[in-house]
Amino acid sequence: MKVGIHPEYKAVKATCSCGNEFEFKSALGKDTIHLDVCGECHPFYTGKQRIVDTGGRVDRFNKRFGAIGSKK
């Protein structure tokens, strides 16, 4: 392998919105990242439903133009 062309591989600290923290190795340029869900709080792994408000494009469209289609 060539010397000096590969990104630095270092420890990154991840913090979830539930408070869970863990470290992993990555070539990511940041020292810390924030996660919305992790293995401790994701509904698939916990079996509990949790509402995650992401406010997607469809919601924005319905908010802007939802009243137009209802007039009949």
UniProtKB/Swiss-Prot annotation:
Presence of the UniProt keyword Transcription in the record: no
Binding site for Zn(2+): C16, C18, C38, C41
Cofactor(s) the protein requires to work: Zn(2+)
Gene Ontology cellular-component terms listed: ribonucleoprotein complex; ribosome
One term of GO molecular function: metal ion binding
Source superkingdom: Bacteria
InterPro entries in UniProt: Ribosomal_bL28/bL31-like_sf (IPR034704), Ribosomal_bL31 (IPR002150), Ribosomal_bL31_A (IPR027491), Ribosomal_bL31_sf (IPR042105)
GO biological process, one term: translation
Keywords: Metal-binding, Ribonucleoprotein, Ribosomal protein, RNA-binding, rRNA-binding, Zinc
Cofactor note: Binds 1 zinc ion per subunit.
TM stretches of this protein: none
Alphabetized Pfam families for the sequence: Ribosomal_L31 (PF01197)
Signal peptide: none
Quaternary data: Part of the 50S ribosomal subunit.
Family: Belongs to the bacterial ribosomal protein bL31 family. Type A subfamily.
Entries under NCBIfam families matching the protein: L31, PRK00019.1, PRK00528.1
Biological function: Binds the 23S rRNA.
Protein name as annotated: Large ribosomal subunit protein bL31
Organism: Aliivibrio salmonicida (strain LFI1238)
